[in-house]
């Protein structure tokens, strides 16, 4: 139920706050609204590192439950759910359109057409260049890297804070400078 999921979400913030009070470092990855909620909830942010995922909108959990039920999938039996596969963009069935294979799936189609979001996503105050996290991650659709590099998988990484710089310096990722205007123009 929706009330149960709200309790679960609050419990996550309580658990994180407890770890911060114990002096532990915590890396929280979530949607911008979830990061903002955690920052509003937490009083101990010195050891809190945040990463937000550049969001296209969050589909309704109830719609996902309906979709899985329609596909005869028992949500209690799921060990994981992958929305993104490089080979098929996470879509499940194949049809034909204009002479080339076209992947069709109503759940993903609704997501890509922005018609299945939770209500607050339609007026999201975090859908801007002003970010709430130390680092923002998203698709790098506007990358100027070669097609060969793109096949390896690339992401847009935006660093907003000293904590973000600290995380990136400790990471083992290859970073390239990007034109922020171009990068943002290709995101949703």
Language-model segments: which ranges?
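Long, compositionally biased charged/polar accessory segments in the mid-to-C-terminal portions
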Residues: 76-186
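Short, charged, surface-exposed secondary-structure boundary motifs
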Residues: 58-67
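A short alpha->loop->secondary-structure connector
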Residues: 43-53
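Gly/Ser/Thr-rich loops at beta-strand to alpha-helix junctions
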Residues: 28-38, 57-59
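Short glycine-/acidic-enriched loop or helix-start segments at secondary-structure transitions
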Residues: 37-40, 168-169
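Generic beta-sheet signal
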Residues: 24-30, 48
């Amino acid at each position: 139920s929706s009330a149960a999921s709200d309790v679960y979400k609050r419990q996550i913030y309580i658990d994180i706050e407890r770890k911060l009070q114990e002096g532990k470092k915590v890396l929280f990855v979530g949607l911008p609204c979830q990061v903002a909620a955690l920052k509003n909830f937490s009083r101990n942010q010195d050891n809190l590192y945040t990463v937000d995922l550049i969001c296209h909108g969050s589909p309704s959990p109830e719609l996902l439950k309906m979709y899985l039920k329609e596909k005869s999938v028992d949500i209690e039996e799921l060990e994981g759910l992958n929305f993104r596969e490089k080979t098929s963009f996470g879509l499940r069935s194949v049809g034909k359109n204009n002479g080339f294979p076209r992947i069709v799936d109503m759940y993903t189609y609704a997501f890509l057409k922005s018609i299945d979001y939770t209500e607050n996503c339609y007026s999201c105050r975090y859908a801007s260049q002003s970010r709430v996290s130390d680092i923002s991650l998203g698709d790098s659709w506007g990358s100027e890297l070669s097609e060969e590099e793109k096949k390896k998988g690339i992401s847009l990484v935006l660093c907003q804070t000293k904590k973000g710089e600290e995380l990136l310096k400790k990471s083992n990722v290859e970073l390239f400078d990007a034109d922020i205007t171009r990068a943002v123009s290709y995101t949703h």
